[in-house]
Amino acid sequence: MAQINCTQVTEFILVGLTDREELKMPLFVVFLSIYLFTTLGNLGLILVIRTDARLHTPMYFFLSNLAFVDFCYSSVITPKMLGNFLYKQNMISFNACAAQLGCFLAFMTAECLLLASMAYDRYVAICNPLLYMVLMSPGICFQLVAAPYSYSFLVALFHAILTFRLCYCHSNAINHFYCDDMPLLRLTCSDTHSKQLWIFVCAGIMFISSLLIVFISYTFIISAILRMRSAEGRRKAFSTCGSHMLAVTIFYGTLIFMYLQPSSNHSLDTDKMASVFYTVIIPMLNPLIYSLRNKEVKDALKKLIASKNQMLSS
């Protein structure tokens, strides 16, 4: 077998969302506004949950971790994308690209698995309310959060190592606004069959298992709600689960659209638009979904603002 002449790539060029100069500044302003709102919303939600004793429950423990993941998730991608709107040569070093891919995969996987943990929490709350504090003890809650973090970071590390051990000799221009797997694989001259098989198996197991947990949990939840005799009880139960159902639908729906569409319809331009949605828009939407639809969070936020105003006026 002939030896591939592999020149070590030291940096990549991120093509970005657009090459039209007149669009770059408006897009910079839009995405900067979204990122600031995302940061304020997610860190604000964590602060509200941490400072209000009424929110020290399993449901809000999971929600604060989801907000943390959303903040990290967005921060891995958006600042570099904002910088690329301002510079003509959108360079990223080899090591920085590897770190970005690894962190992105870790937080995306963690979010996917955390949504499954939250679905299980809602299942226990609706279907086994008398045993809720036993089945969702602090130790179990910690395990339901620690397991997604541990699994996601180990998988992301192995995934990034496999990707960046490949030989890149075709080009160093990544047709994306961040370092993602599929655009990177198009630049390599190494055999990628084993790598693609790893992606398919690992992502498939993670995605199907987490989606199955969510589906089974909500099948039992909806069945239990429909059996409730009290209309007020049904309304309260649907209200409790509605925010999570909406967040799950948006997140998994975007991933299904991106990764399960026919290969004939698959293009990097379509990937870019879908990637904007789940790397930039979803982390901004989640605090809105969980706070605007949640009376306890809104009351805690009002209480926090009132106490801060009282401190400033005294």
From Swiss-Prot:
CDD domains: 7tmA_OR8K-like. Residues 1-25, 76-99, 155-196, 259-271 are extracellular. GO terms for biological process: G protein-coupled receptor signaling pathway; sensory perception of smell. Glycans are attached at N5, N265. The chain crosses the membrane at residues 26-46, 55-75, 100-120, 134-154, 197-217, 238-258, 272-292. Keywords: Cell membrane, Disulfide bond, G-protein coupled receptor, Glycoprotein, Membrane, Olfaction, Receptor, Sensory transduction, Transducer, Transmembrane, Transmembrane helix. GO terms for cellular component: membrane; plasma membrane. It is found in: Cell membrane. The keyword Coiled coil does not apply. Disulfide bonds join C97-C189. It holds the Pfam family 7tm_4. GO terms for molecular function: G protein-coupled receptor activity; olfactory receptor activity. Residues 47-54, 121-133, 218-237, 293-314 are cytoplasmic. Its main location: membrane. It is a multi-pass membrane protein. Potential odorant receptor. Belongs to the G-protein coupled receptor 1 family. This is Olfactory receptor 8U9.
